[in-house]
């Protein structure tokens, strides 16, 4: 299946990567192009842009920082009183590391988690009465990252996800929708599985 993209396409306009996915028109205002929903060669080119961040060697170099932050978070937990593990540990550590990978201020770390939760719950009426309300939150995400994206185009390349996107030929001229789509892909990929793994690991 993975090797036969002509038949098993990942393109969003054909339904994307979800079984039973709904095809979208190219001019759909709420379509968010992202490389996970592209076929080769575009998928391969854009994926390779951010792959260096996640190779084993780089993750090993991040291990001391992760351990230090995890230790500090655990040291700050209340003693002999009930607390919310997900909020105070899982979300906190995940948010800190996401901010590091994007090289954005640590004080904005919970914004990244919030935007991940937003895109995960766009179709849930308990969170948003309409998908459009959720997209207003994502427009704030776009405005936030556009500022960094444009600034890093003008700065020397650095080893962070935004700079990688800003300097590679295949991603340096993305439309606002495509920038938002790929940023959301990276945020959700970093937030959802990591946060759930930390939470599930204590059960």
Predicted regions: what is each one?
Residues 87-93, 139-140, 159, 175:
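Short acidic alpha-helix initiation/capping motifs at coil-to-helix transition points
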Residues 162, 179-187, 191-203:
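Cytochrome P450 catalytic-core helices
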């Amino acid at each position: 299946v993975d090797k036969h993209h002509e038949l098993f396409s990942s393109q969003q306009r054909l339904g994307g990567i979800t079984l039973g996915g709904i095809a979208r028109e190219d001019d759909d205002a709420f379509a968010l192009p992202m490389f996970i929903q592209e076929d080769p060669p575009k998928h391969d080119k854009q994926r390779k842009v951010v792959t260096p961040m996640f190779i084993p060697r780089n993750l090993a170099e991040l291990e001391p920082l992760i351990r230090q932050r995890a230790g500090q978070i655990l040291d700050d937990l209340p003693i002999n009183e009930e607390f919310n593990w997900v909020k105070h540990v899982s979300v906190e550590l995940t948010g800190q590391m996401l901010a590091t990978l994007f090289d954005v201020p640590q004080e904005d770390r919970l914004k990244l988690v919030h935007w991940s939760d937003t895109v995960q719950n766009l179709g849930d009426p308990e969170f948003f009465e309409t998908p459009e309300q959720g997209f207003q939150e994502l427009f704030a995400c776009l405005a936030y990252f556009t500022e960094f994206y444009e600034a890093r185009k003008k700065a020397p390349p650095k080893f962070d996800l935004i700079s990688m996107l800003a300097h590679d030929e295949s991603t340096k001229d993305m439309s606002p929708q495509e920038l938002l789509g790929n940023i959301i892909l990276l945020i959700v990929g970093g937030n959802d599985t990591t946060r759930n793994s930390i939470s599930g690991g204590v059960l």
